[in-house]
Design a protein with these regions (language model features):
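Conserved N-terminal glycine/acidic-rich loop preference
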Residues: 23
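Substrate-binding/active-site clefts of carbohydrate-active enzymes
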Residues: 26-31, 35-62, 66-201
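Bacterial N-terminal signal peptides that target proteins for export
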Residues: 1-10
């Protein structure tokens, strides 16, 4: 019997993922539970703005919860494009009005799934970020009493912003991750970026 291309690629990747998954150091830390046997549903697909709205998922919570333990949803923060799948994030802490619904609908969906014993996992984006009104003006956001404001030093010096005429030059370190031309690549060696990402997660 011939293996499908999917099996040839995905099975080794899944095995590698399992080998590389970190374990919790102590009880109560954020980590995948030991011996977890649940099943997760990807609650969206590309350009699924209508089918994956928070209200649509919530309306199907009872049925979905009878089959799945976790629902994976796209990034819930406001993005720079409209509509957007959430992979061009602007806000991390303060604006949860996305192409999938508003913050009240998001909270209601999470609460409903929780009543059925089903968790929600959000796809978060921390490799790159967009500004609120231009390429680099990241909004100042306050979370748990602390205000986070990233500047040009948070953007990798080899980001495409550096090649734009009339734009200020980013002053962060060279990119340590994947270059994404649609947003500003964040300098993850910068302590301010690290602190904001930890708070966001």
């Amino acid at each position: 019997m011939r293996k499908s291309a999917f099996s040839k690629i995905m099975l080794p990747l899944l095995a590698l993922l399992l080998l590389c998954t970190p374990k919790a150091k102590a009880e109560g830390e954020y980590a995948w539970p030991a011996n977890y046997d649940g099943v997760m549903l990807q609650g969206f697909y590309w350009d699924s703005y209508k089918d994956s709205k928070w209200t649509v998922l919530q309306a199907n919570a009872a049925e979905l919860s009878s089959y799945f333990n976790l629902i994976w949803v796209p990034n819930a923060g406001k993005s720079s494009a409209n509509p957007s799948m959430g992979y061009d994030p602007v806000y991390w802490f303060s604006n949860f009005n996305s192409s999938f619904g508003n913050e009240a609908e998001l909270r209601s969906m999470i609460s409903t799934f929780k009543q059925f014993g089903t968790g929600i996992i959000e796809d978060v984006v921390v490799n790159h970020r967009n500004g609120a009104t231009n390429w680099y003006d990241f909004p100042a956001e306050t979370y748990n009493g602390k205000t986070y404001k990233l500047g040009l030093d948070a953007i990798c010096k080899n980001d495409e912003l550096a090649n734009q005429t009339g734009m200020p030059q980013p002053t962060g370190a060279y990119d340590t991750g994947d270059n994404f031309d649609g947003c500003r690549d964040l300098d993850h060696t910068n302590p301010a970026v690290q602190e904001a990402v930890k708070a966001y997660l």
